[in-house]
Amino acid sequence: MDGVHLGENLEDKDTEFTWEVKANDRTYHKQFKKKGFLCWRQKKYKSNAIHTAKYNIFSFLPLNLYEQFHRMSNLYFLFIIILQGIPEISTLPWFTLFAPLVCLFVIRATRDLVDDIGRHRSDKIINNRPCQILRGKSFLWKKWKNLCVGDVVCLSKDSIVPADLLLLASTEPSSLCYVETADIDGETNLKFRQALTVTHHELTSPKKMASFQGTVTCEEPNSRMHHFVGSLEWNSRKYPLDIGNLLLRGCKIRNTDTCYGLVIYAGLDTKIMKNCGKIHLKRTKLDLMMNKLVALIFLSLVIASLLLTVGFTFMVKQFKAKHYYMSPTHGRSDAMESFFIFWGFLILLSVMVPMAMFIIAEFIYLGNSIFINWDLNMYYEPLDMPAKARSTSLNDQLGQVQYIFSDKTGTLTQNIMTFKKCCINGCIYDSDDEHGTLRKRNPYAWNPFADGKLQFYNKELESLVQGRQDRAVQEFWRLLAICHTVMVQEKDNQLLYQAASPDEEALVTAARNFGYVFLSRTQDTITLVELGEERVYQVLAMMDFNSVRKRMSVLVRNPEGSICLYTKGADTVILERLRSKGVMEATTEEVLAAFAEQTLRTLCLAYKDVEEDAYKEWEPEHQEAALLLQNRAQALHQVYNKMEQNLQLLGATAIEDKLQDGVPETIKCLKKGNIKIWVLTGDKPETAVNIGFACQLLSENMIILEDKDINQVLERYWEDNVHQKAFKMMTHHNMALVINGEFLDQLLLSLRKEPRALVQNAVVDEVAQEPVVSALDFLQKRRISQMWRNAGPSLGTSHSADSKIRESPEVQRERAFVDLASKCQAVICCRVTPKQKALVVALVKKYQQVVTLAIGDGANDVNMIKTADIGVGLAGQEGMQAVQNSDYVLAQFCYLQRLLLVHGRWSYMRVCKFLRYFFYKTVASMMAQIWFSLVNGFSAQPLYEGWFLALFNLLYSTLPVLYIGLFEQDVTAEKSLKMPELYMAGQKGELFNYSIFMQAITHGTITSMINFFVTVMVSSDMSKAGSSHDYQSLGVLVAISSLLSVTLEVMLVVKYWTLLFVGAVVLSLSSYVLMTSLTQSLWMYRISPKTFPFLFADYNVLFEPCSLLLIVLNVALNVLPMLALRTIHRTVLKQRPKGEEEAPSEEVAVEPAMRHLRRGIPARRSSYAFSHREGYANLITQGTILRRQTHVDDSDGGTVCESLNPPEEDIPLQNKDSVFNPRKISILAKKRRHFFGKGSQEEVHPNTSSQTMEKQPTIHRDSETQKLPTTTSATSGKLLPSASEDEAFYSVASQYTLASQPKHTDVHSSFWKSPLWRDSASSSPSQLEVPRKQS
């Protein structure tokens, strides 16, 4: 399946540790050979040169011919040409097929050669990149292709790693090396690699590196991107190696001046190249159908030839019986005569397979590719990047795409994080400078440390900061300046932040602009400049992010000696750790929901003052847990959790992860065209889901299924396999899947032969000591069980029970998963490797039999791009590997809309019309050969002149059909984009299929019968009246009638008339007149009477009025009935009742049975991409990661993060069995918890809200004190209740009702829309309006 074998090649099989690399010893590696093709032996250690091209000078001709003859039509034509070379059976001149076939081969070979030259150029650019290689005792600049295994390489900042290297040393402390892996796994965050301590201390100069003679023994080259095991033997000692010591090819060196590495894998042996599948010849659905149709036509011609041969045999027997005296003149037996006449008929009818159609199709594909290249609407001016069709044979398939598989990083997003809003003490602060007008006047002029690039500015908030009266505001910005792992450097008297995440950098920069400047840090201190005053905080403990905690905390002692804990994290873990939950906390939670509705990435901030005695009691426990050798992570987690209780909420931040321009609109439009979009990313689930909401791939009313839920669905799928209905419930609901790479391994590998240890080894980033919790625990079991009760017995397989039994367990599992996923509106696959991306695409292709498109911009997308039917590479993002292996190149994701809905749909429609008309006109003209055989004694005598047979499809009727293939339009480009529903015709194959093919054949057969038999009958009467009636006149009359009939037919089917089309028709008919005048001239007859036998045949016929009238009669009989039928058909369609025409489908008409599963209130999504493994806090506290103050860098950074739900011990006992158990309901699939407090233990009745609606309090900022007033009931003094809309599922009442927020609280209040909550008792809305994203 296009380079991906299901399951078996998900990860490479366990390999022996037989790969030995000796430093600085090329001779050692050259002696090793491995078995190659047949008896050839090749080098075991490959060079670093890569070759993505298919051909070279010697292999081009044989390989290209081999690919050409994969087409059934070419084999057929070659076979007929061979037969034509036998004089005894040849019935047509040799040039009728030989010249067109040669022309076809030359055109296709030229196209393939041009495409491959482009690949050679791309390979040359990469292979000739420079790098420094150790030669002797110094480093010399060499090309990448000259790099060999065992070489020592020197890399500088911002350079790309040329091969898989073992990090030996770097200029950073402890030989750390920061790399960006965006071109490998799609993540723009910074990851660090570290050299062994022994190499860090010993290899300190080029001279010592030249004397380095260590030997690395490791696993054979494989595709496991996150796994590496080996050992270094040096000076009679062995040192263990893992993936943390390896720099992978394609990584970019960041924040590191210089590093040194030993080449372990080179060229095609590198992990990124192992993840790139082989180049396969992609064939369109129409191309594959054409192979079948050619075989069908050939079979039909064989049958027709057999029947005509039978007629010939019967006729010969009758003739010999009647004229027995002529028998001695026949030297051959009847059987021999029949044998020769059969092949004669086969050659005669070979013109029924139109070779010219394949030639013209090449020009059509080329022309449509040029139109894509010329489309200025897909030209990206900032990069001077037009769209480019690198493949010219897939244009029609662009109009049949049903699944799009998209990368996230760099494809959907720009990877630009912007601080957009914040909420402090329950008050929302938006930016006063949305359009950048204030930044021109430098509103932060009072702050010398301010970063002018920050787009967020709020004058009121600035006044609060400078007033120093509101502690919540001060602690808010102080927390952002302290609680992080950002590194700081100074360059040209400017502070440069090197963050592990763009999120963190945005937060710290925002604090910096508001006067709380992170200045520097040491192993146990952090220095801030707070409103011009320098303050040093002692770091007592740094509680880092991991995959379970979903939060980060820093315990510090301020200069006054007080201890304070600062915590930031996901709202689901922060809110449940608050000391109390009052109105301000409730307001903040409502604001979080509003931010989430605007697809902003939110983060909660909280703090608490810690008593000295409490710290002294906690610190020994912390030290003891930190010194454990076993279960250290679990012990630290428990200690951290003990400290992170009774917090005081400060507020929340909102960060925008910028999408590329037009992404939401593009996805919305494509979904209207019935195109399903799957996101396959190596990034974290939280990040991917946030982007899913931002780009409108996911919506708030979707039912989102994750790993555990899918397993339950699939189990029921297998149990109920006796049912014939396939996922009926899924068609009525808006559902989505969010799954991770580990789940894919478990799902698709659990029943295969590979050991499970292989799957476990593939995910080495996981913290083994952490509690095992699903990364996305979206839905609780109650929802799933209720789903099955509603679904009943309707959920089954689409295949019969018998076929299901015959399938292997792994095939059943794969089919069940694909069937489930295909019923969902969206699928997001997170943490997937490049090979897993290709596997998902291959699974859909195998079980759904649909056209797939993959789009990406990095090397991690190459395998997916190659596996899909159509590969689209985005240029200018993460290198050129995706572009080099793609079929089409775009600069922006939004251009995909025009590529598919305009160029793709047009190309498909044009090719379909072209094929239908070409088959029709071929049969309409050439079927007369069969009818002529019926009246000429089955003699295999051709009816037409040989030149007419050779030039009819190649010249006489070519230009009109070429116009259809290049310029035909049913609607304009603008209407194609406005009506994406038109695209569904291509997905269903409505414009050309076997039914339409048979219609074209039937129509052509009727046309040929009219042209031939009417001509024969009328000519008989004409001969009785004294007009000439001979064989050549009959052939000319039928030929002219056929030519005019098919020309008028194309004039009827063309919808887009231009002067160019009129010129094409005139030129085609003129070419017939000119060529016929030449081939039937006396001059050509004298040269070769055998080749030009029709002397003045057209002249003799056309100068007879009866012949002209006969031609008009034939054309009228062919055209007028079809014109009448089309007119009647269009009239009936126009008069069809509107209700009948727009009747909804069964899927749309059916009311969903599970409304309570929908999320009526938007869930919050955390702004932080939580770490998939431990963060960098331990390195900071150890001093390992800290930089020298003199070091300067200006590079960007990123992070490695992931989010998991809190462990069981973090959940309050009263909530463990509740529907609000956070382990059961994730931030993506749950309603917000309405019980807010421990403050009131009294029962709140639902009718309270209806009694007090008239006196709802107002939540606002007091202009003087800036405090949030207490909100109580006017009648009872209790907090006002509110209930959720979804009472069928959530029945816990709220403790309060939010009132309106004054207009002055948000400078963009005009953009605020309807409230998120409504009172359950009275349907009147609450008056708190929350801002939505500006349109």
Curated annotation (Swiss-Prot):
Report the GO molecular function annotations.
ATP binding; ATP hydrolysis activity; magnesium ion binding; phosphatidylserine floppase activity
Q: Give the top-level enzyme category.
A: translocase
Q: Which residues cross the membrane?
A: 75-95, 296-316, 340-360, 918-938, 947-967, 996-1016, 1034-1054, 1056-1076, 1105-1125
Note the SUPFAM superfamilies from the entry: Calcium ATPase, transduction domain A, Calcium ATPase, transmembrane domain M, HAD-like, Metal cation-transporting ATPase, ATP-binding domain N
Q: Which residues lie on this side of the membrane: Exoplasmic loop?
A: 96-295, 361-917, 968-995, 1055, 1126-1335
Catalytic activity of the protein: ATP + H2O + phospholipidSide 1 = ADP + phosphate + phospholipidSide 2; a 1,2-diacyl-sn-glycero-3-phospho-L-serine(out) + ATP + H2O = a 1,2-diacyl-sn-glycero-3-phospho-L-serine(in) + ADP + phosphate + H(+)
Q: Name one GO cellular component term.
A: acrosomal membrane
Q: What does this protein do?
A: P4-ATPase flippase which catalyzes the hydrolysis of ATP coupled to the transport of aminophospholipids from the outer to the inner leaflet of various membranes and ensures the maintenance of asymmetric distribution of phospholipids. Phospholipid translocation also seems to be implicated in vesicle formation and in uptake of lipid signaling molecules. May be responsible for the maintenance of asymmetric distribution of phosphatidylserine (PS) in spermatozoa membranes. Involved in acrosome reactions and binding of spermatozoa to zona pellucida.
Superkingdom of origin organism: Eukaryota
Q: Which organism is it from?
A: Mus musculus
Task: Give the protein family.
Answer: Belongs to the cation transport ATPase (P-type) (TC 3.A.3) family. Type IV subfamily.
Where is this protein chiefly located? membrane
> This chain belongs to which protein, by name?
Phospholipid-transporting ATPase IK
Q: Where is this region: Disordered?
A: 1192-1215, 1236-1280, 1314-1335
Membrane topology of this protein: Multi-pass membrane protein
Q: Which cysteines are joined by disulfide bonds?
A: none
Q: Which terms are listed as keywords in the entry?
A: ATP-binding, Cytoplasmic vesicle, Endoplasmic reticulum, Lipid transport, Magnesium, Membrane, Metal-binding, Nucleotide-binding, Translocase, Transmembrane, Transmembrane helix, Transport
**Gene3D superfamilies the UniProt entry points to:** Calcium-transporting ATPase, cytoplasmic domain N (3.40.1110.10), Calcium-transporting ATPase, cytoplasmic transduction domain A (2.70.150.10), HAD superfamily/HAD-like (3.40.50.1000)
Subcellular location(s) of the protein = Cytoplasmic vesicle, Secretory vesicle, Acrosome membrane; Endoplasmic reticulum membrane
Stretches with biased composition (Polar residues): 1246-1255, 1266-1276
The record's account of tissue expression is: Expressed in testis, specifically in spermatids within seminiferous tubules (at protein level).
Q: Report the gene name.
A: Atp8b3
Which cofactor(s) does the record list? Mg(2+)
Positions binding ATP in this chain are 407-409, 504, 545, 568, 601, 681-683, 831, 837, 860-861
Indicate whether Acetylation appears among the record's keywords: no
Q: What happens when the gene is disrupted?
A: Disrupted normal fertilization by sperm; sensitivity to sperm concentration and the time required to fertilize an egg is increased; the number of spermatozoa bound to zona pellucida is decreased.
